[in-house]
Design a protein with these regions (language model features):
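Generic alpha-helix structural propensity
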Residues: 5, 16-19, 30, 67-78, ...
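Non-catalytic, polymerase-adjacent accessory regions of viral genome-replication enzymes
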Residues: 1-53
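Short, conserved non-catalytic motifs in the polymerase core
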Residues: 37-76, 93-95, 151-171
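Active-site-proximal segment of RNA-dependent polymerases
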Residues: 71-122, 167
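N-terminal low-complexity, intrinsically disordered segments
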Residues: 17, 82-83, 87, 132-135
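A generic secondary-structure signal marking the coil-to-beta-strand transition
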Residues: 34, 61, 112-116
């Protein structure tokens, strides 16, 4: 499933795989010493967990946000920009995709007999380190590079809500699932 290499991840077209960590660092304009400091998944990388109150269906619930510290956030923004430039998401992906929004998504479904909509509880925390790593290797990254990206973008073994890279990586992880759902 995740190990399939869909056409959208054509390695030759993307200039992948990046086989060396140094290649990734050059692409995101960082040096190894800087990255190595942020590579290990520790509590020290994150600001204090912030509960965020959101209204959903007339009720208030909380979401725990785990934003990275300022330096890690800069690195993640560079990684996010790099991933967005290298890996095209499927045309049906709308969640936090540039130039797409709920209105455009609704237009795509106008006139359809059935539309399935769901909200996954604890969505980002439900996406594990292993699934992020598998999606990146499936997209053509070498194990070393996929491991580094995964370690820099996950927190306590999952995607954190509040990181610049989480939405793109969630879209990447679920692109195979989404593709199977599209009729």
């Amino acid at each position: 499933m995740l190990h399939q290499k869909p056409d959208i991840f054509c390695k030759i077209e993307l200039g992948l795989p990046l086989s060396k960590v140094q290649d990734l660092l050059a692409e995101i304009d960082a040096n190894y010493g800087e990255i190595i400091k942020y590579k290990i998944d520790t509590d020290g990388q994150r600001k204090r967990n912030k509960p965020k109150y959101v209204e959903k269906l007339g009720e208030f619930c909380t979401r725990v946000i785990n934003p990275p510290n300022d330096r890690l956030k800069q690195i993640q923004k560079r990684i996010n920009k790099y991933l967005n430039a290298k890996i095209p998401l499927p045309k049906y992906a709308f969640g936090a995709v540039k130039n797409k929004d709920n209105v455009k998504n609704a237009r795509e479904h106008k006139g359809q007999k059935y539309v399935f909509q769901t909200d996954i509880r604890d969505f980002f925390p439900s996406i594990s380190y292993k699934r992020v790593y598998a999606a990146l290797t499936s997209a053509g990254f070498s194990p070393d590079v996929a491991s580094l990206i995964t370690r820099l973008t996950t927190y306590k073994g999952h995607l954190p809500q509040g990181a610049p890279t989480s939405t793109f990586l969630a879209n990447l992880v679920f692109s195979t699932t989404d593709r199977k759902s599209v009729v």
